[in-house]
């Protein structure tokens, strides 16, 4: 799709699988709120566990914000096979006055590439020139939110899927998987229950945050796109990628929030995108902000095509 083959693609996202490809390829996407787009996999051998349902979302990818918005409207239609689908309007009330955007303050322990800092500043400037009010603000406990995501998803996979996955996959996959596991706590039943309870605490904190700042501007990845085999180098490298580079991606899944990714710039020939995160079922606010950035940054794939010509 980024190369011009097809106009709209369909993906899903439980830890970044819509937003990370969009970032790497210079296209637009939105991970909708959990329950916005119905999902049903008729070929699945068994139902997914509850938290996998609550952290996963189906969504569109396209070359422009307008195409993503149109695709989301089509994909959001009711399907009775998904008991988690929610009938909520795609457009909500506009916040009063200029919309306040929180430019997420990056944690002190994050290794952030200067090109990402520059892209975030450019996106913030684009929003301000479009009438938004942007302030750098610390978002609620991004480290704790990410750890809750990691603990829940890794432990669910270990219990229900790990043996089957390892039996049919390569040593490279085993390296990548063990790198992901390295950052997770091993949970017994009481630990898993505490982790799922913590999810509600985190969501409440973010919902209160959105009362003051309806949109959050955050990085997709804080480091340049890695090489094609970076996830096979070592389990330590994989663990670092998930914790450092992609922390702001996966944390949003456990919150169930809508998050759009829009490309901002090229750095050494590679696209850099940013996330626009909004409150539950406020995909419209995230996409409006993404459209404001796109209006000034342009449709990035056109620059990529010129570069490749």
Give residue spans per PLM region.
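Gly/Ser-rich catalytic/binding loops embedded in alpha/beta enzyme cores
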Residues: 1-15, 99, 121-125, 129-131, ...
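Short glycine/serine-rich loop segments
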Residues: 1-72, 253-266, 270-273
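A short helix-breaking turn/cap at a secondary-structure junction
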Residues: 31-118, 122, 141, 297-309
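Short helix-loop capping/hinge segments that flank enzyme active sites or metal/cofactor-binding pockets
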Residues: 95-104, 152-207, 223, 258-270
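Acyltransferase
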Residues: 114-138, 161-170, 192-213, 291
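Short, surface-exposed loop/helix-turn segments at secondary-structure junctions
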Residues: 194, 225-246
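Small-aliphatic-rich amphipathic alpha-helix that forms the alpha element of a beta-alpha
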Residues: 205-208, 239-262
